[in-house]
């Protein structure tokens, strides 16, 4: 007779609230301080996982702001140089792609690649879009909004990434 053995409900992972670390965005980075706190994992459960909210704040998640006057995207790309990044506007979308070939770091050899796609609001002036990379690795994509009723100018074009020598003024989460 086959019997399925399951962990008690209080020791099971909470599915979408605690996804597998396999899909976390920090493949080439070391452990965080809270990953090294053994008393948490042993006192709560052998299956304890750090809060997803905490790991989201520490990862390279982007921030999108859209107010009355402008549209801005902040994206942490600290492992990429401007030459590794491609920013394109196509119709109502901005596509940001980053890729660098295999290189050596503190933990061995690593290559990274990402692709992000964001919908632009219909009233963003696509002829005035800009993109810059700060000294601390924060990519800032921005564009002013036009008055309603004016043509925002939809076309496909590449946006050059300029390098800034100062750190980003984007808020850290």
Curated annotation (Swiss-Prot):
The main place the protein resides is: cytoplasm
Disulfide bonds, paired cysteine numbers: none
The Basic and acidic residues compositionally biased stretches are 153-167
Q: Which UniProt keywords apply?
A: Acetylation, Chaperone, Cytoplasm, Eye lens protein, Glycoprotein, Metal-binding, Methylation, Nucleus, Phosphoprotein, Zinc
Q: Please report the name of this protein according to its UniProt entry.
A: Alpha-crystallin A chain
Q: Name one GO biological process term.
A: response to heat
Q: Which organism is it from?
A: Oryctolagus cuniculus (Rabbit)
Residue ranges of every copy of the sHSP domain listed in the record: 52-162
What the record says about family reads: Belongs to the small heat shock protein (HSP20) family.
- Sites where Phosphoserine occurs are at 45, 122
Please list the GO terms describing molecular function. Answer: metal ion binding; structural constituent of eye lens; unfolded protein binding
């Amino acid at each position: 007779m086959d019997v399925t053995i399951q962990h008690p409900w209080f020791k099971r992972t909470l599915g979408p609230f605690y996804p597998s670390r396999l899909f976390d965005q920090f493949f080439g980075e070391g452990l965080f301080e809270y990953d090294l706190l053994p008393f948490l994992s042993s006192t709560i459960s052998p299956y304890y996982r750090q809060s997803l909210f905490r790991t989201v704040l520490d990862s390279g998640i982007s921030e999108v702001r859209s107010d009355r006057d402008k549209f801005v995207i902040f994206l942490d790309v600290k492992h990429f140089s401007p030459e590794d990044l491609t920013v394109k506007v196509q119709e109502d979308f901005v596509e940001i792609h980053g890729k660098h070939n295999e290189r050596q770091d503190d933990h061995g050899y690593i290559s990274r690649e990402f692709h992000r796609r964001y919908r632009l609001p219909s009233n963003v002036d696509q002829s005035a879009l800009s993109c810059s990379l700060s000294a601390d690795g924060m990519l800032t994509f921005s564009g002013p909004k036009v008055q309603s009723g004016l043509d925002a100018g939809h076309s496909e074009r590449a946006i050059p990434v300029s390098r800034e020598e100062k750190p980003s003024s984007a808020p850290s989460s």
